[in-house]
Amino acid sequence: MPTAVPEIQHHTALHRFQCTVEGRLCVADYRMAGNVMQMTHTGVHPSLEGRGIAAALVAAALAHARTHGFKVDPQCSYVRSYMQRHPETLSLQS
């Protein structure tokens, strides 16, 4: 049975949302360019794929952007496809 996604942590100094699952670090990285979060990379170990971990990381990043009034540049292909699957997030796109 898939493990529940642990709490997502935001490390502002690293420009990263992350969690650890089964001892493996899972991340959603970004850069700031003014008030735009450039979402550059989402990484989940192949053994953990299909559990909703990447989606949880991206959802946390987009919630942070919305709360702080940032726009999002989805440079990562996973973030782009997530936003397309969740049209309520498209208003964040820069």
Segments the model singles out, each with a brief description of its role:
Residues 1-42:
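N-terminal first-folded block
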Residues 60-94:
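C-terminal structural segments of small proteins and small subunits
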